[in-house]
Regions:
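Periplasmic-binding protein-like
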Residues: 149-158, 262-284
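Short helix-initiation/N-cap motifs at beta->coil->alpha
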Residues: 69-80, 169-197
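Ligand-binding "clamshell"
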Residues: 100-112, 126-128, 201, 206, ...
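Bacterial lipoprotein signal-peptidase II cleavage site
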Residues: 5-29
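A bilobed periplasmic-binding-protein/Venus flytrap-type ligand-binding module shared by bacterial periplasmic
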Residues: 119-132, 239-253
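A conserved helix-loop-strand patch within extracytoplasmic ligand-binding domains
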Residues: 112-163, 269
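Pocket-flanking alpha-helical
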Residues: 57, 75-106, 214-216
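Short, polar/charged alpha-helical segment
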Residues: 40-42, 46-71, 77, 81
Length: 288
């Protein structure tokens, strides 16, 4: 697991990561406004999109709270790091992924606030196909290898008319649950973060908004098919909402509540809409 630290504080348990003296270079009235101490909170993320966290840090400056991002490339790592006390929060996964990880691995972590929906989209290898209609028998389609996003990708292929899945498997079917291939595509599984890199070896790949954005792809402009995230027509949408997660013992931590509240502001909504141009959809209760 590759890991990039923005800051080097450490800590675990109920307290935020670290508390340090605020900088002393500010002068005059500005110095008077600075809090005496800064509470640093380490947040685990996956991918390179972080503009919203810059806005959050600006909003929390007067409260003496500073978010420092720990960037992971392995989707299995942030929940393990959170559970083990290596980070304070994480913000990289949807509710279905979190529920599956807790059930499978016994993590004592919970979501404490909604953030965004990162729609899955089908991206084409432009050297091979130019539209969804051109996908044919034998074409390789790459999908995420983890259970929740892999199942989500199979449901997207079903929605697009390529396969039929066993309805009893709900929203997390596996390849073994495909009951019919309407087009005899060759479905290959790969770790989510690698899908954009292997696109040249496929006809198409199914990539979520975060990994797509990191790879320079935009679901609005570059995809040939995007997941239906309208809750009125897709009952699974509530489980696709990304969340901020904390250890269960910290679910009522006041500092963490302020971070969630800062995320749920018009300023952060504007940053997400301006920076990501449709790659992410704000999904907290009053985001509309």
């Amino acid at each position: 697991t590759a890991l990039s630290l923005f800051g080097c504080s450490s800590g675990s348990g109920n307290a935020p990561a670290s508390t340090a003296a605020a900088g002393s270079e500010a002068a005059g009235s500005e110095a008077a406004k600075e809090p005496a101490e800064v509470t640093t909170v380490k947040v685990g993320v996956v991918g390179e999109y972080s503009a919203q966290w810059d806005t959050i840090n600006e909003l929390l400056k007067d409260d003496g709270i500073q978010v420092e991002l720990m960037k992971f490339t392995d989707y299995a790592a942030p929940n393990r790091a959170l559970n083990d006390g290596e980070i304070d929060l994480n913000a990289f996964q949807h509710k279905a992924f979190l529920a599956n990880d807790v059930a499978q691995k016994g993590y004592d972590i919970v979501d404490i606030g909604d953030t965004i929906i990162a729609p899955l989209s089908i991206y084409n290898n432009k050297k091979k196909i130019s539209s969804i209609e051109e996908i044919k028998d034998g074409d390789v389609i790459a999908i995420p290898s983890d259970l929740t996003n892999g199942g989500r990708a199979l449901k997207l292929l079903e929605e697009a008319g390529f396969i039929v899945c066993d309805p009893e498997k709900g929203y997390v079917p596996t390849k073994a649950d495909i009951t019919e291939y309407k087009v005899k595509i060759d479905i290959k599984e790969a770790e989510s973060a690698t899908l954009a890199n292997i696109l040249p070896d496929c006809a198409a790949a199914i990539i979520n908004g975060g990994n797509a954005f990191t790879a320079g792809l935009n679901p609005v402009e570059d995809s040939i098919y995007t997941e239906n995230v309208d809750p009125s027509t897709n009952e699974a949408v509530p489980q696709l909402i990304n969340v901020i997660a904390a250890r269960t013992a910290d679910r009522d931590n006041e500092v963490y509540k302020k971070i969630v509240d800062a995320y749920h502001t018009p300023e952060v909504k504007k940053t997400i809409e301006d920076e990501y141009q449709g790659a992410f959809i704000c999904a907290w209760d009053d985001a509309e």
